[in-house]
A protein has these predicted regions:
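Structural motif
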Residues: 33-37, 59, 174
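Short strand-loop junctions, especially beta-strand C-caps/beta-turns
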Residues: 6, 59-62
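Arginine-glycine-biased low-complexity disordered regions
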Residues: 44-54, 61-82, 87-142, 146-265
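Conserved interdomain hinge at the start of the Helicase C-terminal
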Residues: 1-54
Length: 265
C-alpha cells in the first residue's frame, strides 16, 4: 500500500479538539476512517463533531447487525465522508460481559444501569459481522488512529484500510504521553512483520499548525464539557433503542436484496 504515516503528539484531553481541527480545517482527504478503542468514545466523538457541523457515522459493537450493515453501506456510498469505528481489540468489553459506560451484556441483551432497559441484540453480531475484520471499507483516503493501536499488527491492520488498489493513503496516529513507548515499539516491529514496510517511518504531521488548533480551543473545551458521561450514556441508550426498531425494517430490506448484504462482508 502507498501510505504516508504520521503522528500527532497530543494530550489525551485534547484528542477531541485535534480530531475536530483536522476535519474542520480540511486537512484529511475524504473519505476518512477514525479508529477508537471504546464504544463510548465513538459516541462522544460523534456527538462532539456534530456540534461543529461535521456529519459522521459511528460503527460499534452494540449496534444491531442490520444497522451495522446499513451504516457501512451508507459510508461506502458516500452518504458520510467520515466514519468512527471501534477497533477489534475493544478494552471496553471484558470477558464477563461488562461494557464500558455502565452496561452489562447478558446473553443477547444489553442491560443499562441508567434505566434498567433490556435492549435485544443480534446473537450472532460479533461472530458474523465484526466491526473491523472482514469489512470492506471502500475508497478510504485517510485513517486516523484516535487511540494508539495496541501493537504493530493492530497498527498495520487498521491503517491498511487506506492506500488500496494502487491509490495513495494517509495514516495519522494520535500519541499521548502514555503512548510514547507503545508507538516506539510499533515503529520498531512493523518492518519485522510486513515485508513491504522496510522503509516505514512515522513523521510529524506538520500541516496542522498549533495556532490553528488554539483558535478552536475555547469553544471545543466548552462543547466537550457539555458531553460528559451522562450525556454519552443517554445518547447510547437512545441510539441502540432506535437502531433496534430500525433493525427489523433493515432485515426485511436485506432479505429482499441479499446481494447488498453479501457485498458488505
Amino acid at each position: 500500500p502507498r501510505i504516508e504515516h504520521y503522528i500527532i503528539k497530543v494530550h489525551t484531553d485534547d484528542k477531541l479538539l485535534y480530531c475536530m481541527a483536522l476535519l474542520r480545517l480540511g486537512l484529511c482527504d475524504k473519505k476518512s476512517l477514525v479508529f477508537v478503542s471504546h464504544a463510548d468514545t465513538a459516541i462522544r466523538l460523534r456527538l462532539f463533531l456534530a456540534k461543529f457541523s461535521i456529519s459522521c457515522c459511528a460503527l460499534h459493537h452494540e449496534l444491531p447487525y442490520n444497522s451495522r450493515a446499513h451504516i457501512l453501506q451508507e459510508f461506502n456510498r458516500g452518504v458520510y465522508d467520515y466514519m468512527i469505528a471501534v477497533s477489534d481489540d475493544m478494552p471496553g468489553q471484558n470477558n464477563n460481559g461488562a461494557v464500558s459506560g455502565g452496561g452489562k451484556l447478558v446473553g443477547k441483551h444489553l442491560i443499562t444501569k441508567a434505566s434498567g432497559a433490556k435492549l435485544s441484540r443480534h446473537k450472532d453480531i460479533d461472530k458474523d459481522f465484526g466491526v473491523v475484520r472482514g469489512i470492506d471499507f471502500k475508497r478510504v483516503r485517510t485513517v486516523i488512529n484516535f487511540d494508539t493501536p495496541s501493537d504493530a499488527s493492530a497498527y498495520i491492520h487498521q491503517v491498511g484500510r487506506t492506500g488500496r488498489g494502487g491509490e495513495e493513503g494517509t495514516a495519522i496516529t494520535f500519541v499521548s504521553p502514555s503512548d510514547v513507548e507503545k508507538i516506539r515499539a510499533i515503529q520498531q516491529h512493523i518492518p519485522d512483520i510486513d515485508a513491504n514496510s522496510k522503509a516505514f517511518a512515522l513523521k510529524p504531521f506538520e500541516k496542522l499548525a498549533v495556532q490553528d488548533v488554539e483558535a478552536l480551543r475555547y469553544r471545543a473545551e466548552d462543547v466537550a464539557r457539555s458531553i460528559g458521561r451522562a450525556a454519552v450514556r443517554d445518547a447510547r441508550i437512545r441510539e441502540i433503542r432506535s437502531e433496534l426498531l430500525n433493525s427489523d425494517r433493515l432485515a426485511a430490506h436485506f432479505e429482499e436484496n441479499p446481494d447488498e448484504l453479501s457485498l458488505l462482508k
